[in-house]
């Protein structure tokens, strides 16, 4: 759920229609025995810009889905220009407090500064909640050992890390596939037993889309319906 961008929830979007999309997604995932993330897709700004609005949104979501053990809440996707100690953590404490009024055990994901690259910034100042994980993102064509080092710093300090967005192209979501870097990332993910989510399940004409731009089917995809990126990720998750 974009709060601002693309006719977002807070800036002109049809709130009822957007919440119906979420409800459909939760129901589909539940029927299939899958986890589903309700993501407040903060992008390029500090999450505290909309603290009260985020609380209102997550109060509604958590009250509705508190009986769903498969629902995960991501409360700020990719903050930018937001210090962990002075901005993101206080925001997270407030929003998490709201969610916990309705759901005391759901997993909550908290993004970190610089498009969720600075997961090491939480070391020594984590949140006082037993079911929170801290978010790291990567795009293999752009982000390499420097981001893995940040994740390792967090892991070595006992910080639980969740990769809630990644792909094997560059950070624009486009460009060529960097297979060498992608395989290095996959080795790192597997050796550290990290959960990851690929961006994105769409047929948009860009490298990161998992579905071929010529495919209009919404389910039941064959390997031929997948993009090169989609086929790589299918192979990456097979057998996990």
Each model region followed by its residue ranges:
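Active-site-adjacent substrate/metal-binding segments within catalytic domains
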Residues: 1-31
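Well-ordered alpha-helical segments within folded domains of soluble proteins
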Residues: 1-3, 37-38, 162-163
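Residue-level "edge-of-site" marker
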Residues: 2, 41-42, 167, 202
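Short, solvent-exposed loop/turn segments at secondary-structure junctions
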Residues: 5-8, 44-46, 81-82, 170-172
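Metal-dependent catalytic neighborhoods of phosphoester/phosphodiester hydrolases
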Residues: 6-11, 47-53, 121
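N-terminal/domain-start segments enriched in small and hydrophobic, helix-friendly residues
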Residues: 22-49
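Extracellular glycoside hydrolase catalytic/binding regions
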Residues: 32-35, 51-72, 76-195, 199-204, ...
């Amino acid at each position: 759920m974009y709060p601002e961008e693309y006719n977002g929830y807070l800036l002109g979007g049809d709130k009822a229609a957007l919440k119906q999309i979420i409800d459909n997604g939760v129901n589909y995932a539940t029927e299939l025995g899958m986890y589903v993330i309700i993501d407040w897709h903060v992008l390029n700004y500090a999450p505290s810009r909309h603290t009260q609005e985020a609380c209102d949104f997550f109060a509604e979501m958590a009250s509705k889905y508190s009986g769903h053990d498969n629902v995960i809440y991501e409360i700020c996707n990719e903050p930018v220009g937001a210090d962990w100690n002075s901005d993101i953590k206080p925001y997270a404490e407030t929003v998490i407090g709201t969610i916990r009024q309705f759901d005391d055990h759901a997993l909550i994901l908290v993004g970190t500064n610089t498009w969720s690259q600075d997961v090491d910034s939480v070391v020594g100042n984590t949140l006082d909640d037993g079911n929170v994980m801290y978010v790291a993102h990567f795009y293999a064509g752009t982000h390499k050992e420097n981001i893995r080092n940040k994740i390792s710093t967090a892991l070595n300090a006992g910080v639980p890390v969740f990769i809630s967005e990644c792909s094997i192209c560059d950070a624009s979501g486009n460009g060529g596939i960097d297979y060498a870097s992608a395989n290095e990332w996959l080795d790192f993910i597997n050796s550290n037993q990290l959960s990851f989510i690929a961006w994105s399940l769409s047929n948009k004409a860009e490298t990161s889309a998992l579905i071929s731009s010529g495919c209009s089917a919404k389910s039941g995809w064959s390997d031929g319906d997948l993009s090169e990126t989609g086929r790589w990720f299918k192979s990456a998750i097979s057998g996990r």
